Amino acid sequence: MNKDVSQHTPMMQQYLQLKAQHPDILLFYRMGDFYELFYEDAKKAAVLLDISLTKRGASAGEPIPMAGVPYHAVEGYLAKLVALGESVAICEQIGEVGASKGPVERKVVRIVTPGTVSDEALLPERQDNLVAAICEQKGVFAIATLDMTSGRFLISELANKTALMAELQRVMPAEILYPEDFAYIPMLNNYKGLRRRPCWEFELVTAIQLLNRQFGTQCLDGFGVQQAKVALCAAGCVLHYAQETQRTALPHINSIHLSQDSEMVLLDAATRRNLELTQNLAGGTEATLASVLDKCVTPMGSRLLKRWIHQPIRQLDILKSRQDMIATLQQYEQIEPLQPLLRNVGDMERILARIALRSARPRDLTRLRTALAQLPLIAKCTQNLGACLAVLLSKNADFSELYTLLEQAIIETPPQLIRDGGVIAEGYHAELDEWRTLSAGATQYLDNLEIRERESTGIDTLKIGFNAVQGYYIQISQAQAHKAPIHYVRRQTLKNAERYIIPELKTYEDKVLKAKGAALALEKQLYEQLFDLIMPHLGALQQTAMALSELDVLVNLAERAESLHYVRPSFSLQRGINIKAGRHPVVEHVMVEPFIANTVFLNSQRHLLIVTGPNMGGKSTYMRQTALICLMAYIGSFVPAESAEIGVIDRIFTRIGASDDLASGRSTFMVEMTEMANILHQATAQSVVLIDEIGRGTSTYDGLALACACAEWLANKTQSLTLFATHYFELTSLPSQLKGVANVHLDACEYNDTIAFMHSVQEGAASKSYGLAVAALAGVPKQVIALAKQRLVHLEEFSQQTKMAQQHPQADLLFTVEMPEEEKMAPLAKAESAVELALRAITPDELTPRQALDELYRLKKLLSSS
């Protein structure tokens, strides 16, 4: 692109000047009915949007690459770009064509970015859409997140980069802002929407001034965030970015909240992944905890429930209050009456954000009107449901005047866009009604004029029409065109007709178009005034939306508890978990056969269980269900069990499954050890820890030694509430050596080389692992199973002979066994020949003489070929 803009046409000079202000993002440049892109933007958009790349003449002697999208379809293209992590500057024509010399005046009116979009078509309906800013100062990491669609503004400070990554994994922002001098950029490689920002945007003084100006305060003490200085730096950056992209006031962003670890049950990234809270291991949303629990009838309720799932809390008073409300809703049978009313509330939270940004569409206002109409009905349903629900719904103000305003101002079913007109209701504004009457009278006038002209000219094919290009016209068929009077001025010739204009029709056309234009301009003005009239109610409306979303979640959890037979858990201030007949909430939901419930009991005297049993026996399910039941209790939900008493929990850790990290060059074993190291460093006596088969990725003795050492550390040092699944039967001796350790196993029965899994947890260690039986079930060839059994006998007979293993620790255990000499010389497994396989497949009694002869020839041929 030529930097000397003077060599370009005036229009391209204007484009280049605007593009220079937004060099790193796509510029949608409005030209008539299209948004055009030029140069590198055009090439990039052509690839991303699968649109044609063309050329627009030449400027400065070079052809200009160009691509474009129709203005009326722009939302679909923006949605695709946002999903790809791209940002777009929208440049509109703000001047009148021909109003001044040179190109029509244009300016960038908004910037659409993945983290700050508010348009309904560009947003995931039931997921939060966040922009985050991160920074680090003197070893303190911080993150600030802003939800532009609700005004929710949160900050937190973190002890290390691992905690920061866990927080990013939790909130999954659509955009991440970081300072130019950020030293940890490589750890962000897996995220889209990365934006490097100048360091001055992270300065503390600048941030505090910006935040005070936004909130209309003199200091931030009232928000309790004044001590979180690093987090405030991040908050300043994210607020500046929001103002820069929206280019309008942000009245719905009116507070900021500091999240503290002491209020939460902490979950690291591995735990969220392994427990499949909102995303399964394959990356989908099926068979997750959220897929079972989330039957909310409003999108804002669904988003709130997912936030609860990802951030369980430790404040017992809030948890018990939620439980009380769920129990009350069940007791008074108000679930079924409330859900249809809440469904009509819709996504009030995001509608209010669009109103605050003055980007709400007419149908947003009708949805708000519908939501307000539900409030008296919801209040009536809940008026006798106890103090807790009364406190929740006390946030609802009286919006009867606002409802009346919207009822009078907006028609019942308005068009999608204000530019289409016909949004403001008749009777709302006298002048608008006058302009509309003048415009509407055109139909009768034109009918009368058509009849009069037919009679005066004698042309029976004469008719009056209108189109956007030609305006009003008189049309006469070609066969009768010669009869047109002399004062008819030809406007257009068609194949079968001629079109004319007369002075009277032209005068009326000007009058009607003026009336339509005046009506539309006044309607847009009145529509903007509606935003001004709603704005004083915005804070109260936001509080009401929050209350309704919480009510939706609680009604939903009450319905889930009732439908799925969940019980109310109790909380204890003592350390421990006592779950009677617990069930995995997801597995039982997808199973056809009945789920086998199991009990888990952990306390200060019994805090580590060695879990043994066969593969597929249910060890992982048992462990995960324990963690999920604890998590469900700590969001205020009822749980799948006969009874559950949950003690104080500060964190939940999991080390389950095997996966490598090729992008970072880490093997499966390295990933496993990294996760284990995090647990050993961070776990406390109040943590719940799930360990599944640690030590598999290295030599047998190394793995056994690591597993034993980790179990001892968890038993003696951290004394966490731990479920430790293993196939190393040597670990089952730990209860006799360590305090607080016990054995449990998943039961199974073996009969005639087949295995039946009981999925029942029993006290004591398993008798064997049944690995060969499971391999047979998986379809491993019988010859391989037979060979494995043979080798297993020798391994068991000579397992005490470890001399070679001690001399060569990494040697395969199979070759540490002294086998009889004749078996050393024997082939591992003689494969059956083609002839033998063919013979085995023949059933002689079923063959006719002719078939038998054919088979004999086939066998002889096979023998010759082999």
UniProtKB/Swiss-Prot annotation:
Family: Belongs to the DNA mismatch repair MutS family.
SUPFAM superfamilies: DNA repair protein MutS, domain I, DNA repair protein MutS, domain II, DNA repair protein MutS, domain III, P-loop containing nucleoside triphosphate hydrolases
One GO term describing the cellular component: cytosol
Stated name of the protein: DNA mismatch repair protein MutS
GO function terms (MF aspect): ATP binding; ATP-dependent DNA damage sensor activity; damaged DNA binding; mismatched DNA binding
Job of this protein: This protein is involved in the repair of mismatches in DNA. It is possible that it carries out the mismatch recognition step. This protein has a weak ATPase activity.
Gene from which the chain derives: mutS
CDD domains per record: ABC_MutS1
Name of one Pfam family that matches: MutS_IV
HAMAP family recorded: MutS
Binding-site residues, ATP: G613, P614, N615, M616, G617, G618, K619, S620
Coiled-coil annotated residue ranges, if any: none
Signal peptide range: none
An annotated GO BP: mismatch repair
Keywords, alphabetical: ATP-binding, DNA damage, DNA repair, DNA-binding, Nucleotide-binding
Classification of source organism: Bacteria, Pseudomonadati, Pseudomonadota, Gammaproteobacteria, Pasteurellales
Originating organism: Haemophilus ducreyi (strain 35000HP / ATCC 700724)
SMART domains: MUTSac (SM00534), MUTSd (SM00533)
